[in-house]
Amino acid sequence: SKVSNQQITDLVNLLTFVADDKTVQLKEGVQITDEIKDTISQYKSGGITKDNRGVLDEYYTDEKLVNAVRNLIKDNFKGKTAINILEPSVGMGNFLHAATDLGVKTNITAFEINDTTAKITKLLHPDTQINLRSFETEFVTDNGTKKDFTPQYDLVVGNPPYGSHRGLYLGLGEEEKITRYEDYFVKRSLDVMNEGGTLAMVLPSGWLNRAHKLTGAELTDAYRLPNGA
């Protein structure tokens, strides 16, 4: 039976909570059944998130695309026993499937600004650390003070927001020269990626025209998707 977004929101609020450190946690004793997964997977993105980023910034990535990305990266981690993975704008977690079955233990950290989708993702991927805050908060405080950061990820995956970089963090002096969200997410993901790491993102085709500006990274593969994909 069909369920509404509001019913799904109510359900995930019953099952999860947001800790003081802004991570989403499961409530004690919660058992995630197939029925729960089926129900919450029906959530439809829409409306305006509390950060006033509209639906355009919430991407729900196609399964075939995610599998294709996984096939491209799956042999990159031979010889490692464990890797740290970042998904900087996780949405409902579809792209996390690209980080499965890589032949190594994975420690996954994800960021999401929408309360409901962050909680859905925690229920669908309970072993992932889900942070209910924007990726920008890794680099700047709410009063504009720059934060120290260190490279820590071996793999970054995702389908980041596209379009003009706007809003609070730009105003706080966070990468003011970067005018587009996708460029910001690539640059900052590279900043926290270990030497020899892999970044695999779905980006608008126009990004390739600006890829030469990347420093400290090498573009190894680029695939153009069909229009409307």
Predicted regions and their residues:
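Glycine-rich phosphate-binding "P-loop"
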Residues: 53-57, 167-178
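Conserved proline-anchored active-site loop of SAM-dependent methyltransferases
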Residues: 69-72, 76, 84-101, 133-137, ...
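Short loop/turn motifs at secondary-structure junctions
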Residues: 81, 104-107, 152, 195, ...
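RNase H-like polynucleotidyl transferase catalytic core
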Residues: 107, 133, 141, 151, ...
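Conserved Class I SAM-dependent methyltransferase catalytic core
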Residues: 115, 177-228
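Short amphipathic alpha-helical segments
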Residues: 122-123, 168-171, 212-214
